[in-house]
Amino acid sequence: MVYSPMSRPQVPLAFRQWPPYNYKSDPLVNSKLSQSTTSVNAGPSLISPSFLDSYANSSSLLHKPSTNLGSLKTSSLLASDEVFPSSVMPQLRPLDSSLSVSPEMDGWPWHHNSSSNPQGYAWTPSLLSSNATSYLHSGSSPHGNTSNHPSPISSLESLPSRSSTGSGSLDFSGLANLHDDSKSLAMSLNMAGVPVSVDENSQTSFPFVHGQPESTMSRKPKLCVQSKSMTNIRNSVAKPSLVRQSHSAGVIPIKPTASNASIRNAPSNLSKQFSPSGNSPLTEASKPFVPQPSAAGDFRQAKGSASHPHGSGSSNGVAPNGKRALYKTEPCKNWQISGTCRYGSKCQFAHGNQELKEPPRHPKYKSERCRSFMMYGYCPYGLRCCFLHDESNAQKSATIKQSP
């Protein structure tokens, strides 16, 4: 499986052990080994080379497991002169350990600044010889056929390098040398990273950098300062509430007539008479036309108010003469109990049988028997029930129906 450089775990150089630890070159281990071999004690040494070799073959950080890629059949140890830690980047190792390790096979492909500047490389500058860098960028292996060693990099020909010979999809010859102080820079980069010409008289397209406002950053000055009252008058005259101003919805504009011409010309007349301060008064000619109610409408309104003096009665209970339809149709309870009423002649109820009137009834009033009274002998409506409760009254109503 091939990993991209961005998906690999990249450990910072400050936290790596560089160069990687090698027990064979460790002076402490060598001193202990020499002491154990030269000691008088005939017993087994504390740390034997065979034990260290077996430990290195099994669990050392320099050990390369064989299960990383299927094409790698046998495990192999890294060479002692290899300065790349396999714990940070476990990638393909060459099957033949006698071959010199190349950067491409070592699986560290993304540090490609230049051959003369080794900053950022994972290997020492001694490995960056001419043939190594050409092999790194051109893709031609110095060992001949590398088909048995698949590389994690698909192609290195597009990587920029001054030492590459055939990589020319990227050309950096036109850029100015920013590290050379002897050359005067003819091009400069603006804030967006775009090269622009540097001139003392000309300014860049960023006026806020120099602190000098330009015309593009400011709005156009207003010719006339309108007051709030002037704006309200213009809106009220130029845009009537009953006429829609937008014609996009299919509304046909009103045909200009003699009455509409005064309204259309009102804003222009107002603008001529008003000063910028907006303190000039309105004249009679410039006042908007407001339709006044006609005399016939006033007469109708007055007549309607006279016909409804109280305004509390509904259309169902109000007679044409303005009085209730049920006026004096029920006896006054206060008059029946005490014989007096505080309302007097203004009372809406009848004070005696002389004033009692028959209320307007439905034509079928008391013409049928009450079902609840016939079945149960009781009716919740009582005397107000519109149906018959007495048999005598029922017989009378039946005879009245048969007589015509």
Curated annotation (Swiss-Prot):
Main location: cytoplasm
A GO molecular-function annotation: RNA binding
Start and end residues, zinc fingers (C3H1-type): 326-354, 364-392
Sequence segments annotated as region (Disordered): 134-168, 259-322
The UniProt record lists the keyword Metal-binding: yes
Biased composition (Polar residues): 134-149, 259-283
GO BP terms in the entry: cell division; negative regulation of conjugation with cellular fusion; nuclear-transcribed mRNA catabolic process; positive regulation of conjugation with cellular fusion; positive regulation of nuclear-transcribed mRNA poly(A) tail shortening; regulation of cell cycle switching, mitotic to meiotic cell cycle
Pfam families reported in the protein's UniProt record: zf-CCCH
Keyword Transferase: no
Location within or outside the cell: Cytoplasm; Nucleus
PROSITE patterns: ZF_C3H1
GO cellular component: cytosol; nucleus
Keywords, ordered alphabetically: Cell cycle, Cell division, Cytoplasm, Metal-binding, Nucleus, Repeat, RNA-binding, Zinc, Zinc-finger
Annotated TM spans: none
SUPFAM superfamilies linked: CCCH zinc finger
Record field: compositional bias (Low complexity): 150-168, 304-317
Job of this protein: Binds to specific AU-rich elements (ARE) in the 3'-untranslated region of target mRNAs and promotes their degradation. Binds to ARE present in the arz1 mRNA and stimulates the rate of arz1 mRNA decay. Required for coordination of septum formation with exit from mitosis. Involved in the mating response pathway. Induces sexual development and ascus formation.
Subunit structure: Interacts with moc3.
Name used for this protein in its record: Zinc finger protein zfs1
The species this protein was found in: Schizosaccharomyces pombe (strain 972 / ATCC 24843) (Fission yeast)
Gene giving rise to this polypeptide: zfs1
